[in-house]
Amino acid sequence: VYDVSTEQLGTFDLVFVGSLLLHLRDPVLALERLRAVCHDRLQVVDCVDPMLDRFGRWFSGARFQAGDGRMEWLVPNRRCLGQMVEAAGYVDVSVGRRFTIPFRATRGGVAHASVTARNPSALAD
């Protein structure tokens, strides 16, 4: 994902990123690189840590867990996930409500959130 280019893939009106960012060492860089192929809208659906939301809606943070044998680098809360998209240069960022996706390995499933945004270059068209 760090090496995507318009020469390889062209551009897309919608780029969907699903349960990917938590597995990347630099998720903001990945989102920045995806802007090259994102003509207009970005939709991110990824894991979030509901425990971090308990600190209040203005708290932005992530649980770093690399090195403990898991495949995830970090799991943000909803606010942090939205700020990662903003930091990657997208605009009109909107963070949706938290929801749970059933997963057999965990009781109760895995918390996720959805973020929608636009590539600022689409607004100039």
Task: Show where each model-derived region lies.
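S-adenosyl-L-methionine-dependent methyltransferase catalytic module, highlighting the catalytic core
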Residues: 1-9, 16, 25-123
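Short catalytic micro-motifs in class I SAM-dependent methyltransferases
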Residues: 14-20
